[in-house]
Amino acid sequence: MNNETTTLISLKEAMKRVDHKLQALETQFKELDFTKDNLMQKFEHHSKALASQAAQDEMWTAVRALQLTSMELNILYSYVIEVLICLHTRVLEKLPDLVRGLPTLASVLRRKVKNKRVRVVWESILEECGLQEGDITALCTFFIARGNKAEHYTAKVRQMYIRDVTFLITNMVKNQALQDSLLRAVQVIEKGKAVRTPEKQKSSLEELIPSVKN
């Protein structure tokens, strides 16, 4: 075997070794890319979870911090509970075969996560009412945090106590998300549907509280 042949064989073997190393590196890069993608997905999921938890904590704090008289609390609670009952009733009307399996609004909220049929109906009802999931979170938080000390006022009783509940909400509720959700709850009950950018009415204190003669 001459030197040229030996050199050629050595060169081929060297090229094979280089090729094997390149293939190994390519495999490692693919594994790294896969690991990176997994880490990014986990990070994004974790970030969303933290953001959601932070928003829930902020909402809970905002609800607990409300300085309301018993009358004011009862009025806001009345709108909240009527909206939640309305939503639950509409779900049952569209899913009559699931009435026994959806005895409460909480059961609807749980089932919609895994049940597409319930989820589609729920989303359509929210759209019909002009509400979003964030509104439901706010209203449920209010119900859970303050409902145990509140009582329901009928529409007639509410009108006896206050003429413009919008004025009450915009002045007493400082958290914007909670304020917007409560305003939409009022719109759903009084007008049948909420407007995403409600027009905030300005009222004087004389307009807000009816006189004894009225």
From Swiss-Prot:
Coiled coil regions in record: 6-42
A family per Pfam: DUF4547
Cellular component annotations (GO), alphabetically ordered: membrane
Disulfide bond positions: none
Domain of life according to the entry: Eukaryota
InterPro entries documented for this protein: DUF4547
Keyword line: Coiled coil, Membrane, Transmembrane, Transmembrane helix
Membrane topology: Single-pass membrane protein
Keyword Transmembrane set for record: yes
Localisation per UniProt entry: Membrane
Transmembrane segments: 65-81
PANTHER family to which the protein is assigned, alphabetical: SINGLE-PASS MEMBRANE AND COILED-COIL DOMAIN-CONTAINING PROTEIN 1
Name by which UniProt lists this protein: Single-pass membrane and coiled-coil domain-containing protein 1
Record gene name: SMCO1
